[in-house]
């Protein structure tokens, strides 16, 4: 819920808030669930299938190993662009395979958030090498 509220607030600083909010929300969700809470893709698939996803998220949030981790967010605006940087305290991941919709995951019950953010919300997504920090950039259109 905190992530959704912050996403809605930050989206207002982008030229198309309705598009930006989707990407910001998805990137926040990934930072918390897959980054700080260290829930891998396959486990999330199984937890959703057996209807225990929310229970596992709550359990990990209460676990000091994961629950004390934070997501850091910064916003930067220049004459050329607007950018949001999201950093989590997780181990990182191999982000490249998620930048575009993979037909092999098309029927999965999750796993399209990064591709949606990349295609709909930002002109560019840049991850650090480790995969625990992403910057979403929207370039200003010249009139």
Question: What is each PLM-predicted segment?
Answer:
Residues 25, 76, 139:
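Short loop/turn motifs enriched for small/polar and acidic residues
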Residues 1, 81-85, 91-94, 98, ...:
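Flexible, glycine-/charge-rich segments associated with ATP-binding catalytic modules
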Residues 34, 110-112, 130:
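Short glycine-rich loop/turn motifs that provide flexible caps or phosphate-binding loops at active sites
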Residues 1-29, 33-63:
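Bergerat-fold GHKL ATPase/HATPase_c domain
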Residues 42-111:
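Glycine-rich/acidic phosphate-handling loop/turn and adjacent ATP-lid/helix
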Residues 11, 72-73, 117, 139:
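Hydrophobic transmembrane signal anchors and adjacent membrane-proximal interface regions, especially
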Residues 18, 22, 107-115:
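Short, conserved micro-motifs enriched in small and acidic residues
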């Amino acid at each position: 819920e905190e992530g959704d509220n912050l996403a809605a607030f930050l989206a207002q600083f982008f030229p198309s808030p309705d598009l930006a909010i989707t990407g910001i929300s998805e990137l926040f969700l990934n930072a918390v669930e897959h980054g700080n809470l260290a829930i891998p893709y396959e486990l999330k698939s199984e937890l959703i299938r057996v209807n225990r996803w929310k229970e596992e998220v709550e359990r990990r949030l209460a676990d000091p190993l994961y629950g004390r981790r934070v997501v850091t967010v910064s916003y930067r605006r220049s004459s050329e662009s607007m950018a949001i940087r999201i950093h989590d305290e997780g181990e990182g991941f191999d982000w490249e395979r998620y930048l575009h919709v993979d037909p092999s995951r098309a029927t999965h019950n999750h796993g399209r958030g990064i591709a949606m953010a990349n295609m709909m919300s930002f002109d560019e997504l840049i991850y650090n090498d480790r995969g625990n920090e992403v910057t979403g950039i929207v370039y200003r259109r010249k009139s």
